[in-house]
């Protein structure tokens, strides 16, 4: 899980979702997991 100021999609499978006011990226590739922090 990467914590970044700006989250963005890295590949086609990445999806932007919002959980409890946090923007997160979920993907089939675990390396692409991100959340805004």
Curated annotation (Swiss-Prot):
Disulfide bonds: none
Cross-referenced Pfam families: Ribosomal_L36
Biological-process GO terms, alphabetical: translation
Subcellular location: Plastid, Chloroplast
Family to which the UniProt record says this protein belongs: Belongs to the bacterial ribosomal protein bL36 family.
Entries under HAMAP family matching the protein: Ribosomal_bL36
Protein name as annotated: Large ribosomal subunit protein bL36c
Origin organism lineage: Eukaryota, Viridiplantae, Chlorophyta, core chlorophytes, Chlorophyceae
């Amino acid at each position: 899980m990467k914590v970044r100021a700006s989250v963005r999609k890295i590949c086609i499978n990445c999806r932007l979702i919002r959980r409890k006011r946090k923007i997160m990226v979920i993907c089939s590739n675990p390396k692409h997991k991100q959340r805004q922090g």
